[in-house]
Amino acid sequence: MTINKETGTDPDPGYKPTLRSQDKAALKELLHTRLVECGWHKDIKEMIRNIIMERGVDNINRDQLAAQIVPQARALVPEVVKNEMMLRVHAALDK
């Protein structure tokens, strides 16, 4: 069988590796622990409080708050945490 751009190189192009539910739970717990340890969790809670104080609790809803916080929160995740999680996810997928 020849391999070209049309046929691809994957033996099963429909195959997508998935994480087991135990692995997902363990990874979520690890991520939460790392974010608390590095102070990210505290910083995000403070950002949320500041936004609510500035705009007033009656002038902002959950969706507006999330739209404002999520991009900043993602950008503030330390690279070391991102790298560790990436390695752990790849290891879990290779099982």
Swiss-Prot record:
Q: Which domain of life is it from?
A: Eukaryota
InterPro entries, alphabetically? Answer: TF_ENY2 (IPR018783), TF_EnY2_sf (IPR038212)
- Cite a single GO BP annotation: transcription elongation by RNA polymerase II
Tissue-level expression: Expressed specifically in testis.
Q: What GO molecular functions are on record for this protein?
A: chromatin binding; chromatin insulator sequence binding; transcription coactivator activity
Offer a single GO CC term for the protein: cytoplasm
Q: Which HAMAP family does the record match to this protein? A: ENY2_Sus1
Recorded hits in PANTHER family, A to Z, give: ENHANCER OF YELLOW 2 TRANSCRIPTION FACTOR
State what this protein does.
Testis-specific paralog of the ubiquitously expressed transcription and mRNA export factor e(y)2. Cannot functionally replace e(y)2.
Concerning its family, UniProt says: Belongs to the ENY2 family.
Recorded protein name is: Enhancer of yellow 2b transcription factor
Q: Which organism is it from?
A: Drosophila melanogaster
Q: Which gene encodes it?
A: e(y)2b
